[in-house]
Amino acid sequence: MAHRSVIPFGPQHPVLPEPLHLDLVIEDDRVIEAIPQIGFVHRGLEKLTEKRDMHQFGYIAERICGICAVGHSCGYASACERMLDIEVPGRVQYIRTILHELSRIHSHLLWLGLLADAFGFEALFYRSWTLREQILKIFESTCGGRVILSINEIGGLKHDIEDSELAGIVQTLDAMRPDYEALVHTFLDDDSCGERLHGVGVISKKDALELSMVGPFGRASVVDYDVRMFGDGAYADLAAFEPIVATDGDCYARCQVRCAEVMQAMDIIKELVGKIPHDGIGGRTKLTPADGARGEVVIEQPRGEAYYYVRGNGTKNLDRFRVRTPTSQNLAGLTHALQGVLIANVPMIILTIDPCISCTER
C-alpha cells in the first residue's frame, strides 16, 4: 500500500483568495479525500436580526457578500415583501432584475480574471478586469456605489433609474461585447488553457443530481436547472432565455457555462430595458408583520440557487432570518470533484467551482 499523507490547503493560499481550508489526503500525488473546514470569517449576521429593525437589516443583508450584494439585497427585500403581502410595481421588478444580471456579469468577469491569473495568463487577467470595471462604473453612475448599491428597500426602490440611464447601460454593454467575445475566444481556444482544464475534476450528471449541485457548477454537468426559469425566483416571463448547460462536467465545461452566461445576461438586460414599464418604484412602508408570519424566496445568484427565509414576531424586528447560499450546496460537489485528481490540479478545480466563503459563513 502506498504511503498516505495529509497536506493542508488554505485558508490562505496564493491561488485562492477565499479563506477555505482543505485537508487533502494524498497517495502518490493523487488526492484520495478532501476534508473541508470553514468558519474562519463567520460574522453572525443572521443573529443581528434581533437587534436591527427590518429596514436597518437591509443594509446588513446586502453586506453578506460584496460580489453578490445585489442578489442578497433583492432576496431579503423579496422575502420580506412575501411575508408582508406587498406587491411591488413592475418597474421595480425590472430594475432589480437588470441590476442582478449586471451583478452576474461582474461576478463572472471577476472569476475569469482570477482564473487567468492562476494560469499565469496575465494579459487575460487585465483584459477581463478592464471589462469588469465598466460594470462597476455602471453601478456607480446609477446607484452611487461600486459594490454596495443600497438601492433596494422593502416595498420598492429608494430612487429610480431614469430611462436615459438605462439606455446608457445598453450602450455600454454593446460596446463591451466585441471585446468580451474576443477575450472568451482567446481563453477557450488557447491550447495551454485547454490542456489544464479538459478532463479535470469531472462530475457526471448522476453525481451532480445526487450531490444537489447548483448554478454553473451543476449546469456544466447537464443539470438543466436555473431558478430564473423555475419557482418563486423566476423571471422567465420578463425575458426570453434558456438555461445554459454543458455536457462534459469538467473544469473546461464550467468555464464554458460561465462565459456564455455573461453574453446571455447582456441579452436579458437589453430586452428588459426595451420594455420596462413606468408604473412607479413603490416606497417605504410601515413594517408590522403578524406574529409568526413567514416569507421565503429563491433566486439565482451568480454561483447558483440562494434561499431566503424570514419570520416576523409582531414587532418591527424579525424573529428569524435565514440564508442558504449556493456554495453551501456545492461543497459536497467540490470534495467529490477533488477525489482522484493530481494535487497540482486542486487549485484549478476549486477556482472553476468558484466558491464564495463570505456568503457561506455570514
Residue spans of the language-model regions?
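Active-site bordering "gate/hinge" segments
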Residues: 1-362
